[in-house]
């Protein structure tokens, strides 16, 4: 049933991993997805939010029958619309610069994690001391 009173329409922003998944492998809990679809069918917006790429969240929103909008890359990108559009809020160039700066100052190998391609960030494997990297970022006043 579609919500008749537009003042009662709500927007639900729902995390994917660890919230509507069954395990660390990304298996979607179908019961949770069904409840979210019921909210959408009742006239509410159901938006998926994830640290993954927004394209992954967007595809799940389509196949799951939810609102065709997803926030991804830790808030860096919004993917939406029936004609797929991306709103970039982050700047991948700044991330690449920060990575190069950290790599030049730490004496360890820093590897990018093989994940779905990102538009606004880089994803790193946990092969280095994050606190040392944070000190470099802060000391060089990097905008990441």
Give residue spans per PLM region.
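Non-catalytic pre-domain segments flanking phosphatase-related domains
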Residues: 1-14
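Hydrophobic "anchor" residues
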Residues: 19-20
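Active-site phosphate-binding/coordination module
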Residues: 27-116
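Conserved acidic, metal-coordinating active-site core of Asp-based
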Residues: 105-144
């Amino acid at each position: 049933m579609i919500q008749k009173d537009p003042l009662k329409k709500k927007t639900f922003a729902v995390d994917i991993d660890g919230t509507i998944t069954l395990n660390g492998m990304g298996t979607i809990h179908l019961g949770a997805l069904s409840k979210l679809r019921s909210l959408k069918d009742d006239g509410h917006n159901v938006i998926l939010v994830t640290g993954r790429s927004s394209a992954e969240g967007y595809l799940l929103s389509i196949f799951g029958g939810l609102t065709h909008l997803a926030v991804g890359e830790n808030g860096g990108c919004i993917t939406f619309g029936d004609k797929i559009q991306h709103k970039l809020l982050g700047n991948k160039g700044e991330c690449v610069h920060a990575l190069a700066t950290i790599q030049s100052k730490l004496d360890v190998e820093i590897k990018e994690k093989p994940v779905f391609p990102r538009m606004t960030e880089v994803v790193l494997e946990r092969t280095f001391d994050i606190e040392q990297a944070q000190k470099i970022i802060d000391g060089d006043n990097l905008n990441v």
